[in-house]
């Protein structure tokens, strides 16, 4: 769902030949589909897991929580409003969002009380971005090697001579991307894999928008895929549960998401309809 970071990296970094705005529009309906399916499953299974620790829903508490988070809830409004409003480029929208966040944190919430606090936050962000840029740089170098070695052309020639059905190609693509999502860091996967699958998809008549959303949906699926899905490891650490238990209880949710990814894959208008009617 917008504003999704990985779509920004894929399109803003030139990995996919579509704009950030188009990726946001293409990802809206698939994102709502996955959210709706997982929410339905959680609501359906909640009562079956027992009532221990469950609290009744109180509208007054919900309103109070929403009011307390009002400034934070406006962050995506600032980002998307400035971008889709037409008065900011993606880079300018990012800068405007960062400035708005800084004002909220330092002036309204007063979490940053001095220049020392601000420098600490900037240093932490710099370390994070440095790691991401290092991964992207190495992955981009590997991608250039693949292009120079004509690996995408060889892959297209092999696929078109071996696979004669678009639907079979999509099934194989999902299986490959599921493995990649469970084993490869997503930033590197975007830079290395997307330039390979886009020519393959175009050879089978698939649009880059559709392929980009299929890729991102499978990466999210890979986060839940045992045995090394990142979200499984984080959940095991956060809730202090053994990895085997976290994996076991996540399998039904994984199955629900697999159905959602297959719908996104085989019903292309979920990704292409909104960009076509929203210029």
What does each model-identified segment do?
Residues 1-279:
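Alpha-helical transmembrane segments of multi-pass membrane transport proteins
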């Amino acid at each position: 769902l917008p504003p999704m970071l990985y779509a920004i990296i894929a399109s803003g970094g030139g990995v996919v030949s579509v704009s950030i705005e188009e990726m946001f529009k293409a990802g809206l309906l698939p994102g709502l589909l996955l959210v709706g399916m997982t929410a339905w499953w959680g609501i359906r299974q909640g009562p079956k897991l027992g009532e221990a620790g469950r609290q009744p829903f109180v509208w007054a508490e919900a309103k109070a929580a929403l009011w307390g988070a009002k400034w934070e809830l406006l962050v995506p409004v600032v980002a998307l409003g400035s971008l889709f409003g037409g008065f900011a480029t993606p880079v300018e929208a990012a800068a405007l969002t960062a400035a708005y966040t800084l004002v909220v944190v330092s002036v309204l919430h007063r979490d940053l009380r001095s220049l020392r606090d601000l420098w600490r936050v900037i240093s932490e962000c710099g370390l994070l971005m440095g790691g991401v840029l290092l991964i992207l740089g190495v992955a981009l170098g590997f991608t250039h090697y693949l292009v120079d070695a004509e690996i995408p052309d060889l892959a297209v020639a092999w696929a078109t001579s071996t696979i004669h059905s678009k639907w079979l190609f999509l099934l194989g693509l999902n299986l490959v991307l599921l493995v990649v999502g469970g084993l490869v860091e997503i930033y590197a996967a975007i830079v290395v894999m997307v330039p390979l699958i886009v020519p393959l998809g175009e050879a089978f008549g698939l649009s880059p928008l559709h392929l980009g959303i299929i890729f991102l949906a499978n990466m999210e699926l890979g986060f839940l895929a045992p045995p090394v899905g990142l979200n499984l490891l984080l959940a095991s650490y956060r809730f202090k549960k053994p990895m085997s238990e976290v994996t076991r209880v996540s399998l039904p949710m994984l199955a629900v998401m697999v159905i959602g990814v297959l719908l996104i894959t085989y019903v292309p208008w979920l990704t292409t309809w909104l960009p076509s009617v929203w210029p």
